[in-house]
Amino acid sequence: ISALIAHAEVSGRLHLSHADGEKPIDIHFKGVAGVAGVTTGTAFVRQPPANLRRVKDARTDQPEHELDEFQAALGEVKAELRQISDSLAEHLARKETALFDTYLRMLEDHTLSGEVCQRIRSGETAPTALKYVVLDLVARFEAMDDAYLKERATDLMDLGRRILAKLLHEQSEHFEYPNDVILVAEDVTPVMLGEVDTQSLKAIVSIKGSANSHVAILARSLGIPAVMGAVDLPLGEISGAHVIVDGWRGEVIVEPSEHVLAEYQRAIDDAAILELDLEQIEPGAAMTADGTHVQLMLNAGPFGELSERQRSWIDGVGLYRTEFIFLARSRFPTEDEQESEYRTELATYAPMPVVMRTLDIGGDKSLPYFSIAEENPFLGWRGIRVTLDHPEIFLTQIRAMLRADSGLGNLRILLPMITTLDELRASKALIERVVLELTAEGHQVSAPEVGVMIEVPSAVYIAPELAREADFLSVGSNDLTQYLLAVDRTNARVADMFDGFHPAILRALQAISQAGKKAEIPVALCGEMAGDPLAAVLLVGLGFNELSMSSGALASVKRALGTFSSAECRFLAEQALQSESGQHVRRRVAQAFLEKQLNLLVPPNLRETLQVEMA
């Protein structure tokens, strides 16, 4: 209720100011940081093309006509997607525009088009059938716990709305965008983004969504800031307003004052200087100031390609999520289909190691063709529990991975959601069985290294035992932080409480690192912490020797690590472990960055505060 009151007050303030002919000043709206960066521009509010939820149920006695209408609408949407993909091709790598190929496959998939056609044949009109099929799929994805998979609901809803608009024969609108567009919508989608000239697009702001959404990934590739989950932003009142988008803080400021605008302009100028500075970073592996090698690994997904310079910085792939292969189909992929996908990934980075996480589904992360309903899916049947209960799924995937690795030898297998030693032992036994089977069949395969993903509190406490039987440990810092602090990081109301610098998180990380060191096995971390320069220095001090991150974070992390010695990293980590709050830890590390003249790697708000205190 308090949130609704606050929203109404802000909307009223904007409305009254507009009615009086006066501009409101410095109205702040909080969201979630989607893509770091700061910019200013003109808000352009984009409405969805049609509303599926408003479609009234109707039946038809001419199903063939409705089928023809549906197929025609489908064809028009496909043509638009191809056109948008072509327009973005000159600004994005092929792997990034490939998401539009994914959309096309979604439109052709039996789960969507097949079910719509089936309902039409049963007597429903095309709009009615489309409504029920799309809303059902959207509900399934929205129920998933995994942030990336949850975001696929937005993609499905957008495709459904576009098909509906064609079915209703609504004319495609031609929008006149300003030359400094801040694209704002309840759910900004990649297709909406693709409709705007990339030279004019300055930032995106979405009421829904998170940093894992496709549109945030595209914004990151285009180098534009994004704020997601700005739930209190009154869409009906801000179109045409001058706004600041702060992708560092996850904040939108409507009609900023001259004073605030001047402050942010300094941040914009600093960001440009930092970009030029990072472009000067030399090729080669990441090293601390005293020459200690820190392995920078890549979080690989369906999007993003590395430049030759970036490729020289990495030591391999720290996390490849195999869910993508399963989500792109209306059935379980065959062993041969999986082998082909895995082979491409392994060969791309060979001879560097590629860590492939086995299928992580179950509970709230069900596939459209493998639905699982539970009262408490967050703590239910998921991860390794599902694949051990369904060994046919696990065995097929392991067979595909090992066949793909034949002749390359750079495969590492990562097991998700391990909570007991028995789960690790059972998984390893199945992997050993596959090695023997494939060898007997004449395949040239070798036993891969098998690691455990530490992402739940129980795994932290049994890390020493897990480390004795695993070949490596890999911390999923996003989920571990969420579980330890009981904070949903995609919820804008509590997003500020999601803090990887919290002493409890750092002490858990230290325990994991020490367990790996005692067992003499590598310990990696994949998650947002690894890509944060301030956190990366702490992680090295805590003993982590592998940091896995998105390609966009490689340069800033390499720059930071090259300025601190191993001893300095350890000293900062020791201080952090004795701190009482995450805020205190962050301030202390940021202060060390300022002392090293790494000012531009410190978030602007924190940098300004510390510079005033140090003056």
Each model region followed by its residue ranges:
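Non-catalytic, soluble scaffold/interaction modules
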Residues: 1-348, 354-361, 386, 390, ...
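Conserved alpha/beta-domain cores
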Residues: 273-615
